[in-house]
């Protein structure tokens, strides 16, 4: 037999976050926090067609033997590693692993290139020696003005790679670059919100690539193994 549970003491549970003060949800700062995310999320949803188009082209490249090459500076450098592992080691059991690398993982190479050729060359240099025309370049930038990412995308275009950019704010110089095949913008000036949306974006990219792989005839006759 189990013992009866002791009565709840509101004074102690409040400190544990188990009660809600109605006054806190009415605080305009709380509303502002959520409202600031509503418009960017809706604008992202309106890019569904653009996201699907990018994923279809990614799936075609993977099907033809290409790999995904991801890069970004600062916070986006960890996103690049996150994206790569999502494809190489899917979190969902049964999904096929797909080849992907992050150009931010090799610290020795990144710092070596930066020391001799400058930060702007850290991705373009690696792409010239690690990528092929069959591959996919995915550049991530919070504000769209990262010189290293822009240079990487330009080099990827020269190599004949499929180019995709995830950018924030108004898109910056990367959005204006003709070397980008697929541009996905997280429309917010707040880098925290941009980060949240970009994580969602590349999770959707991963999921839709697999959707295309699972549809017979979408990529080519007999594509589904």
Where do the model's predicted regions map?
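A short, well-structured juxtamembrane/interface segment
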Residues: 43-64
């Amino acid at each position: 037999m189990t013992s009866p549970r002791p009565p709840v003491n509101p004074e102690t549970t409040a400190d544990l976050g188990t009660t809600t003060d109605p006054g806190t949800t009415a605080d305009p700062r709380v509303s502002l926090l959520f409202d600031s995310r509503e418009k960017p999320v809706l604008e992202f949803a309106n890019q569904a067609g653009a996201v699907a188009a990018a994923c279809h082209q990614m799936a075609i490249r993977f099907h033809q033997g290409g790999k995904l090459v991801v890069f970004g500076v600062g916070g986006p450098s960890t996103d690049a590693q996150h994206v790569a592992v999502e494809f190489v080691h899917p979190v969902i059991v049964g999904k096929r692993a797909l080849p992907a690398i992050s150009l931010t993982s090799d610290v020795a190479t990144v710092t070596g290139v930066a020391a001799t050729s400058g930060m702007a060359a850290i991705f373009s240099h690696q792409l010239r020696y690690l990528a092929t025309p069959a591959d996919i370049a995915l550049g991530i930038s919070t504000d769209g003005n990262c010189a290293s990412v822009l240079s990487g995308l330009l080099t990827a275009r020269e190599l004949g790679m499929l180019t995709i950019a995830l950018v924030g704010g108004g898109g910056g110089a990367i959005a204006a670059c003709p070397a980008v095949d697929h541009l996905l913008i997280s429309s917010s000036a707040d880098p925290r919100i941009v980060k949240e949306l970009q994580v969602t974006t590349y999770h959707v990219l991963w999921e839709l690539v697999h959707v295309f792989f699972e549809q017979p005839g979408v990529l080519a006759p007999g594509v589904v193994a």
